Amino acid sequence: LDYWHMVEVRDYENLEDFFAKNQVEEMWCVSTKAPRSYTEAAFHDGCYLFFGKETKGLPEDFLRAHYDACVRIPMRPDARSLNLSNAVAVTVYEALRQLSFPNLRDFGKMRE
């Protein structure tokens, strides 16, 4: 796509590798097993968002260790979860909304 030049991709072996290489002051874990909605989180600039695999989610020991930082996207009782890309989009846009959409155009213009 034509916007890859705006993306910085970093690859980590696992969660331990990530934490060894980054200083994490604020984080949120998005999981179907979380106690509260993502809309209850107060997202700040520089926070990290963690999402697990579509098939398994984040490891339960990781969720237990960071339970106060776990949030969920409300779902119908008969549906398991959103797919990963949709869950990321929903959560990231809520975080950006709370930060007043920094560096994003927040207006539109009709063609004349």
Regions found by a protein language model. Give the residues of each.
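Post-transcriptional modification and biogenesis factors for structured RNAs
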Residues: 1-112
